[in-house]
Amino acid sequence: MKKRQVVIKQRKSSYTMTSSSSNVRYVECQKNHAANIGGYAVDGCREFMASGGDDALTCAACGCHRNFHRREVDTEVVCEYSPPNANN
């Protein structure tokens, strides 16, 4: 599941405009299914797949909550600069 977040910041005293775009996805499940017996075992689920809509919090593959899946954030920052007008 991917989410996209766009943040635009603009400073009044500056001539720089910064735009940031983040893609969030949830990859392999890290839930320890053997924690109650003192061991360590994961289920092998490689990627979170929402059961139901995109906003579902349960994985269709392993049945775990989304928080058990490792979160990856890819952020892209774009800065645009326009020099001050020399005629002012």
Curated annotation (Swiss-Prot):
The gene is MIF3. One of its GO terms (biological process) is regulation of meristem development. Pfam families: ZF-HD_dimer (PF04770). The keyword Metal-binding applies. A zinc finger (ZF-HD dimerization-type) spans 26-72. This is Mini zinc finger protein 3. InterPro entries: ZF_HD_homeobox_Cys/His_dimer (IPR006456). Keywords: Cytoplasm, Developmental protein, Metal-binding, Transcription, Transcription regulation, Zinc, Zinc-finger. It is found in: Cytoplasm.
